[in-house]
Amino acid sequence: RARDLFISLPGLTLAIDEVSKFEMVMETARKAIYNFIRNEPSQIKIYEMEHPDILLWAVWCIQQYAKMVSREACRGKYGVLLEDIMRFLCQDKHPNLILHDNGLLYTYGTNRAVTWMNSTVNGHPVIPRTGYIVEINTLWYNALRFAGELSGEAGNNALAESLGALAEKSGKSFVNVFLNEYGYLLDYVDGNMMEWSVRPNMIFAVAFDYSPLNSSQKKGVLDIVTKELLTPKGLRSLSPKSGGYNPNYVGPQIQRDYAYHQGTAWPWLAGFYFEAYLRIYKMSGIGFIERYLIGYEDEMSSHCIGSISELFDGNPPFKGRGAISFAMNVAEILRILYLLSKYNY
């Protein structure tokens, strides 16, 4: 699946000095991206390319290459691809995204799952996230800033200025739409309908290199996530204080589908949590992260030898569930270990 691919790729390759493997996989992904952008039939079986956040995760993936290899190499290999993705999005050509005048991206998710919280029952999403979705617009702002800077470095000043202006508009709208009076971010907003449940999707606005939030706002979001979502095995998909909390991924398929994103803990989200933690606490946060990561050592010999389960129950004893090895979890743990080894914030 496309989302899993782009989130996992940096950790599974760049973080362990396998740059050539990153480039090989991205070459295949590049073909799939262009097939989608050009509305051409594709022989490449990368599923769900049409989902609204996929191209934005592809930009994030390329951004990690720029950080972990070099910006110059990134411009040379992926500069044109990056600009083509951004033009496609800015020209409002994506079939499942609408670029509104306020600079935010809107998507319809009432009747179909459109994000990583994609559990469905009888063809309907368990969590019908629709409208302005917080992580999609966080990815969007980050992509605008990163692509704008890289385009400027490549001498494409017109595109750089256009993306920068759109980022300014998007950033202001993001704060107005998502930040609530309690200091955390709404999960999604559709007109007068606001989703107040505390979910982990807000953590990306603290973790990413470019965020519309200021330092105080970032710390407020991180504090809420720490208090309500952090477990020894990852971030809960829903706060115990929110309605519908169901931390146990057990029972028949339909029962597990309802619980999938309603309180279970996901290790891959902890990778972004720790990236956010380092941005706020810098060197003083390293000890906490190192102690936390030690907790996965027992897990690697409990449910699957040498790997990490897909998800965990959200309450003690935080039992491993789902697939016995999950690429996004492994990737983000490797990426955080890399960040700790190269720490230079």
Predicted features by range, described:
Residues 1-6, 43-55, 122-138, 187-213, ...:
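Solvent-exposed loop and edge beta-strand segments that line ligand/cofactor-binding
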Residues 18, 74, 78, 129, ...:
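Residue-level preference for long, well-ordered alpha-helices that form the structural scaffold
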Residues 90, 97-100, 141-249, 291, ...:
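Catalytic cores of carbohydrate-active enzymes
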Residues 306-309, 341-345:
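C-terminal non-catalytic interaction modules
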